[in-house]
């Protein structure tokens, strides 16, 4: 397998030798997107909550946190997230509120790859195209996000863009 672009990134990129990863995904996601310790943004543990349910138990990253997507968008980049957000489901705390102009995926921790339901507790449907809840039962979620990401890259191939593709598969 030839990977010239990946090889170039490895040869010319930055190596982080003094970094850590939290034991659960939310704090690591917050650190990756903000470049700051996740506690500063209120992300100390695993966040969960249904956007369409009660928000009394929703944990969310503080919306005042500045994300990589916000900085790049201000610099003229198109910004998109395909897949998992998991930094807050409450309105005002989603990816479209934190610098991404496009989001296709889920807001909570993980969803079933065919029903697109979050399966902890009572469970709830969690699949969105931007802020619109969509239903595509029976379609394989990893393929859906790849297809959407490829379409986005083709549409914006003549301009700079930052695309984050966050797969759900590590949870299954």
Q: How should each PLM-predicted stretch be described?
A:
Residues 1-172:
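Formylglycine-dependent sulfatase
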